[in-house]
Amino acid sequence: MSPTGFTRAAAAPPPTLSRHAADTARLAAPLAIAQLSQMAMSVTDTVLLGSLGPDALAAGGLGANLFFVVVTLLQGVLTSVSVSVAHARGAMAEDRVPHIYWTGFALSLLLAVPAFALLSFAQPLLLAFGEPAALARNVGEYAAVLRFAAPGSLIGVGLMRSFLPAIGAAKRLLWVSLAGVGVNAFLNYGLIHGAFGLPRLGFLGSATATTITIWLTAITLVALLHGRSTFRHFVAATRPRLPLMGELFGIGWPVAITYGVESTLFLATGLTVGVLGESSLAAHQIALNVASVAFMVPLAIGQAANVRVGYWAGAGAPVAARHAGFVALGLGVAFMSLSGLVLIVAPHAIVGLYLKLDDPANARTVVLATSLLGIAAVFQIVDGMQTVGSGCLRGLKDTRVPMLAATLGYWGIGFPTGYWFAFHAGLGARGLWWGLAAGLASVAMLMTWRFHRKSAALGVRADARGQA
């Protein structure tokens, strides 16, 4: 998408459904690859930490998970930047964009303060939860390094992933993210093992490498944004505005809560599966990992829908906003249906990427993982639907009711249903996954219904203004 593509569209007739689909896919593709690149960095860290032994892997893995949970929740607040920019551009008020950018920049730095504080107290927090003292100490040391990456993550991932797509610069995220995978792998190996002339830091080398990579990513994205004449007018120097910061926070904090509600659902499900034994937990991790990779695509489509629905809503074109949302929902469901078909057709091949299928010791895990992938085929469709629906509603600046819907669906329906199926109906891990599917399906239906109602009401209000 060209940087001026939205502006040209504002003066033209509303796009056809096929044009909506093409524009959404064009915007979502680099976002999906950027998110997959972030997953690749995590996999690299895990593999290289594993070379140091189980203790390093456990401490580094838990420390990294703690970091990413904290910053991901806070990044949810910054999703308000993209919809605010999209609305401003749709309304042909691009002079407001620099104010949104610099206010969002200041907000990202403020959000880094609680992230830094939480990560500073990782060791006492883990001790309070009864973790072994040695593990808590190692995780505390790992998090103490990663805490310095919090501002860079909130700027380079939180702010830039919201701002760049909204001004038509999503491809910058793509190339910088891909480069970050290589830089992270090089620094991880070098700092863990003392290779390439770098100091040998052991498992803390991984935290140091991740911190450096995150900051390099943030600095590069900011430099590309400010250095290109095409985008410079979007970031013209101006002071952050406190009322605008309150508006951005008001839109964004329910998104952060929604992220937290969903994250805790999957965390609680994993802990509950662990009660069923190691084979069940291993099968659960395999199925969840596969589903997480596929989820990156509808997540990106949801981010694209956020921008496109917001743009057309800001332009005062409610029909185009409605079409943009439902086309995005269709794309998300279509992709996840194809992905689910792969899980149904080739589950053994997928499980074989994680385990040796001919090893008798893996037999129970293979059977259960194959079964869970079948459930994941259904789970994925509604998961994609709910995340795209959430993005559509963010485009209308509607975040508080979706937060309540997610809380109800995940914790009022999903987890209780899964628990009952697992322990009262005797389905074990499969029951918990059916519970996840039920919770996600309820949220998907609520999000879709809410978008239908909100977008229809937007059209009614526009018609009333036109008649007046």
Curated annotation (Swiss-Prot):
Q: Which Pfam families match?
A: MatE (PF01554)
Q: What is this protein called?
A: Probable multidrug resistance protein NorM
What family is this? Belongs to the multi antimicrobial extrusion (MATE) (TC 2.A.66.1) family.
Give the matching InterPro entries: MATE_fam (IPR002528), MATE_MdtK (IPR050222), MdtK-like (IPR048279)
Starting at the broadest rank, the lineage of the source organism is: Bacteria, Pseudomonadati, Pseudomonadota, Betaproteobacteria, Burkholderiales
Name the residues that span the membrane: 57-79, 100-122, 142-164, 173-195, 205-227, 248-270, 280-302, 323-345, 360-382, 401-423, 433-452
Keyword annotations of the record: Antiport, Cell inner membrane, Cell membrane, Ion transport, Membrane, Transmembrane, Transmembrane helix, Transport
Q: Which organism is it from?
A: Burkholderia mallei (strain ATCC 23344)
What are the GO MF terms of this UniProt record?
Answer: antiporter activity; xenobiotic transmembrane transporter activity
**What broad class describes the main subcellular location of this protein?**
membrane
Function, please? Multidrug efflux pump.
Disulphide connectivity of cysteines: none
